[in-house]
A protein has these predicted regions:
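Bacterial Sec-dependent N-terminal signal peptides
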Residues: 1-25
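Pepsin/retropepsin-fold aspartyl endopeptidases
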Residues: 19-367
């Protein structure tokens, strides 16, 4: 079954924050800690961490597409975490909203405490429903800027190092993106024609590749005779319909991916910052590399891993599922889709798929 796609791309503030480059010619980077992570649908990375002195661990998504660090509003209410108006807003695919923030807090990772963090407050109830487990927050730029972070999708472990001279693994390639609060990488797209543009590298997006409709309209990169299908996605501000198609080739550094599932977003709130950025590459491609993210040097090292040649998922059902009150429930059904033709309706309870009755939404989305 087609994976429900969660596009989670935040842009904190309207201004651009540039990460200053620091030089550590003589001081080697030091390993501070390492810990396991879990993959959600689309390769999205889930880690557990503690907040201040609260003993119950929180579930966080590790997201290079987030311009800060944030908490779920329901989590702040449950644990009575104080927060105040920030006077700032976040921009997502379905809207713009003002956010509060909780100031001067500590994030406790296994073997590492990160202090003096300001957490923005957002409603992540839809994330919890999509993934079938409580999502308490997002870890983004506020964390990445402080360390060198190695993400190993073979061992399913994250290693955190101090800034300094770092010995990268042999092989692979070194990207040198433009680093604002989010990494922006020049890429080459080939379909009806060949186009070069900038794209965000977004580990929090559970998809392969996305381009804005404005980018496609202006570049005319897609073949017109290929008819996209409609899907529904979830992001900041609510739900939004999007088109799904295939691009002949997407090139990231020296690596070429062919027949790539591609989402087309009518980006009315310009969350993708077009025309400077054409869209994003998500973690269903990035998970095919072991990555080392080094904001201080403005470098990202990619090393192809055991998932590099995994097949893309081209399946399409036209249904979104959510985990609500212990049940897996169908949401909007795209008219004309296979789910629509099968007679599935909004609010139907999904008891099982292909003789699997596990009631596990993550499993159902991969069948």
């Amino acid at each position: 079954m087609k994976t429900s796609i969660l596009l989670y791309l935040f842009f904190i503030f309207s201004s651009t924050v540039v990460c200053g480059q620091e030089l550590y010619a003589d001081k080697p980077a030091k390993l501070l800690t390492q810990f396991p992570f879990k993959q959600l649908n689309g390769g999205v990375i889930l880690i557990q961490a503690n907040f201040n002195e609260i003993t119950q661990p929180f579930n966080f998504i590790l997201d290079t597409g987030s311009g800060a660090i944030s908490l779920d509003s329901a989590t702040t209410a449950e644990f009575k975490i104080p927060h105040v108006s920030s006077g700032r807003s976040v921009n997502g695919i379905a809207g713009i909203r003002e956010v509060d923030f909780a100031q001067n807090n500590t994030l406790g990772l296994p073997g590492l405490k990160v202090d003096s963090l300001d957490f923005y407050i957002n409603d992540y109830d839809i994330l919890s429903s999509v993934y079938g487990l409580k999502i308490d927050g997002i870890i983004g730029y506020s964390f990445f800027k402080k360390y060198i972070v190695n993400i190993d999708f073979d061992s399913m472990r994250i290693r955190v190092f101090t800034h300094g001279k770092y010995l990268y693994p042999q092989g692979g390639t070194m990207l040198r993106p433009l680093f604002t609060a989010l990494p922006i990488q020049p890429m080459t797209i080939k379909d009806a024609r060949t186009v070069k543009s900038n794209f965000y590298l977004d580990t929090g997006a559970g998809l392969c590749f996305l381009m804005s409709k404005a980018f496609n309209d202006d570049s005319m990169v897609l073949r017109r005779k290929r008819k996209p299908v409609s899907i529904q996605v979830q992001g900041l501000g609510g739900k939004k319909e999007m088109s799904l198609t295939v691009v002949s080739q997407v090139q990231l550094g020296p690596y070429k991916f062919r027949k790539v599932p591609t989402n087309i977003l009518d980006d009315e709130f310009n969350a993708t910052s077009y025309p400077f950025v054409g869209g994003l590459i998500g973690n269903d491609i990035l998970r095919r590399f072991n990555m080392t993210i080094n904001y201080s040097r403005r470098e990202i090292h990619l090393l192809p891993n055991s998932h590099f040649r995994d097949a893309f998922d081209y399946s399409y059902t036209g249904i979104n599922m959510y985990y609500i009150d212990g049940k897996i429930v169908a949401d909007e059904i795209i008219k004309g889709s296979p789910a629509y033709k099968a007679g599935i309706k909004k609010d139907d309870v999904i008891m099982g798929i292909n003789n699997n009755f596990s009631n596990d939404i993550s499993v159902y989305k991969t069948l």
